[in-house]
């Protein structure tokens, strides 16, 4: 079965079995909602078990979750550093123009017909995502995911068309 990373358990939260998760999910509210089915993977990326979310809330930059049948700090401390993943079957359907992060990673980024590089990761610093583009012989380009910059995302052809605003590429 294919799984996709949605977050890392970075610490416990209180004594009642809550976990502090650093989310890397494109749809965190949906992914961590009550009843969601996720999989737990250890620090060697080995499957541990399926888990069910029983509660979720946001606190600062973290998602605080509680898992079914894990109601005390002693039951969850061993999971610090583990990864939460969603199975492909549990990802859900997307609306037109939506896509998952794992579909974007590795896509070729073009301005007109000039290859700029490839998306290597996606950051979530605030109001909008920032795509990190790996370039040949240059520093990585930080590309804000906003309409004037990202013109088209063609998932089947693994291509992103952009228009670099003045000052966005400091190496040109």
Swiss-Prot record:
Keyword terms, alphabetized: Chaperone, Cytoplasm, Ribosome biogenesis, rRNA processing
Compartments it resides in: Cytoplasm
Coiled coil: none
Top-rank taxon, per record: Bacteria
Pfam family, one: PRC
Xref: InterPro entries: PRC-brl_dom, PRC_barrel-like_sf, RimM, RimM_N, RimM_N_sf, Transl_B-barrel_sf
Any one GO molecular function term: ribosome binding
Residues in PRC barrel domain copies: 96-168
A cellular-component GO term for this protein: ribosome
GO biological process, one term: ribosomal small subunit biogenesis
Family named by the database record: Belongs to the RimM family.
Domain notes: The PRC barrel domain binds ribosomal protein uS19.
Subunit structure as annotated in this protein's UniProt entry: Binds ribosomal protein uS19.
Role summary: An accessory protein needed during the final step in the assembly of 30S ribosomal subunit, possibly for assembly of the head region. Essential for efficient processing of 16S rRNA. May be needed both before and after RbfA during the maturation of 16S rRNA. It has affinity for free ribosomal 30S subunits but not for 70S ribosomes.
HAMAP family: Ribosome_mat_RimM (MF_00014)
Name under which the protein is recorded: Ribosome maturation factor RimM
Species, as recorded: Streptococcus pyogenes serotype M28 (strain MGAS6180)
């Amino acid at each position: 079965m294919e799984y996709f990373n949605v977050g890392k358990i970075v610490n416990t939260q209180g004594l009642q079995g809550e976990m502090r998760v650093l989310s890397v999910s494109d749809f965190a509210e949906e992914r961590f909602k009550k009843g969601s089915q996720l999989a737990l993977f250890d620090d060697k990326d080995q499957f541990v078990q399926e888990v069910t979310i029983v509660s979720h809330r946001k606190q600062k930059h973290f998602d605080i979750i509680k898992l079914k049948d894990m109601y005390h700090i002693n039951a969850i401390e061993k999971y610090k550093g583990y990864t939460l993943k969603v199975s492909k079957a549990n990802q859900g359907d997307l609306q037109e123009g939506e896509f998952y992060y794992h579909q974007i990673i590795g896509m070729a980024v073009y301005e007109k017909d000039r290859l700029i590089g490839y998306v290597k990761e996606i950051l979530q610093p605030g109001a909008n995502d920032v795509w990190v583009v790996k370039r040949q012989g240059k520093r990585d380009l930080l590309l804000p995911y906003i309409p004037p910059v990202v013109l088209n995302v063609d998932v089947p052809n693994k291509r992103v068309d952009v228009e670099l605003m003045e000052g966005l590429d400091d190496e040109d």
